């Protein structure tokens, strides 16, 4: 991508990892040059140049604290606008010191601590992923002399509250947010950071040796999978709208058996080959259900009602009145399995479709 100037850029954003790298760089620069930078130019791991504004910076003796405001561009998320503070302490090594020129990166208040196996970070450590850690380290090393070492402490004011609105509690990351971002760049409409937060669920499930994983769109599926399937928390994988991405990850990680489970409004789309189920991408629920209903009945008036329905629940009511609800949704659930099996052929799939109350509408076996 070359260079992105985030003082001007409004479409792209920068990750929590890029915030930490920029803040750490500005703090160390202040310590070494006694100059407060209003912005810094750092490099990501691909060699792209990122120009990131610095919100505030202050110094006490050999420590400087820099604040960077998270900016998500057009992909507004829960972390947009939050402050990330980086406290950098610089030490000069003498000839007798046992330390070597190095960068130490630690977490502080508002940065989560990992408690479960299977993630990129070991249990007991702060949730600072390897790629952003490497980006922070590389940019700090560019300022260090051979006889210097530095400690960078990352903290996020109110990070513990913000984290409650993320997947961190489910992943076993407690007390704060994660420092994420492979490239440091948040691309519009890509949801890269959000996808990156979803994928570790698979690692946790595999670390607990679950053979069958239950893929659900979100909270409704999670709630009823625990009740109907007696599923364990770490066995349930919340996919959101990103079925293609998450199933690619499952295949990549060697998952053999997946149960697709959730509300008809999302799962029906999979039968039509729609693997990003966000309504802005595609919404063919009515058309798909109309097509499968037409295999059972030629009642044109009813088919028209299905096409004109406002919600999937309305269609469920129409099919119930006609007495063909189960027959239609069993066909749909079987088609979901066929669609997924064609693309992710090494995974054994089953499918269960429910309504808002958790009633089973149809299943593939």
From Swiss-Prot:
**A GO BP entry:** methylation
What is the enzyme's class at the highest EC level?
Answer: transferase
The superkingdom of the source organism is Archaea
Q: Does the keyword Chaperone apply?
A: no
Record flagged with keyword Methyltransferase: yes
Task: Give the pathway annotation.
Answer: Cofactor biosynthesis; adenosylcobalamin biosynthesis; cob(II)yrinate a,c-diamide from sirohydrochlorin (anaerobic route): step 6/10
Q: Which GO terms describe its molecular function?
A: cobalt-precorrin-5B C1-methyltransferase activity
Gene3D superfamilies (UniProt xref): CbiD-like
InterPro entries per the record?
Answer: CbiD (IPR002748), CbiD_sf (IPR036074)
Keywords attached to this Swiss-Prot or TrEMBL record, sorted alphabetically, are: Cobalamin biosynthesis, Methyltransferase, S-adenosyl-L-methionine, Transferase
List, alphabetically, the SUPFAM superfamilies matched. Answer: CbiD-like
- Please write the reaction equations for the catalytic activity of this protein: Co-precorrin-5B + S-adenosyl-L-methionine = Co-precorrin-6A + S-adenosyl-L-homocysteine
EC code(s) of this entry:
2.1.1.195
Query: Record's Pfam families?
Result: CbiD
Identify its protein family. Belongs to the CbiD family.
Q: What is this protein called?
A: Cobalt-precorrin-5B C(1)-methyltransferase
Query: Whose protein is this, by species?
Result: Methanococcus maripaludis (strain DSM 14266 / JCM 13030 / NBRC 101832 / S2 / LL)
Tell me the lineage of the source organism.
Archaea, Methanobacteriati, Methanobacteriota, Methanomada group, Methanococci
Report which gene this protein is encoded by: cbiD
